[in-house]
Amino acid sequence: ISPLLLVLKSGINFNAKIIEEPEAHLHPELQQKMTRLLINMMNLGIPVWITTHSDTILQHINNMMKLKNHVRSSELQKEYGYRKEDLLYREDVQMYQFVPDNNGKTHLEALEATKYGFVVPTFNNALEKIVEEVYAFQED
């Protein structure tokens, strides 16, 4: 996270920031903080591109888009310690996922934002399978 803080504090005008797997080796709490820094960079006008396998990053982005337009946004920002620089307009975010086809090839698929944010089927399917196993394996 320190390099991102340095970028924000430096005042240097970057054309863009591209980061592969920014969540690598980070606890989910730090992933959320790192995502907050990336959003701050975006709100400073720095285009940010990331690749991720982190549902934590995805959910934080969704939360910040939802909070931006929430009817109680100011109240919730105070309650949870966010500032306007931490929030995102839905139209400022684009998400894609790689999807395998039946021919063994992979193609890029644009994801549409719902009123709850972006839904990533490849993440959700894996998480649902894990939850299903948890319940099955806990049965007596």
Set out the residue ranges of the language-model regions.
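Switch/communication elements of ASCE P-loop NTPase nucleotide-binding domains
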Residues: 1-137
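Carbohydrate-active enzyme catalytic cores, enriched for enzymes
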Residues: 140
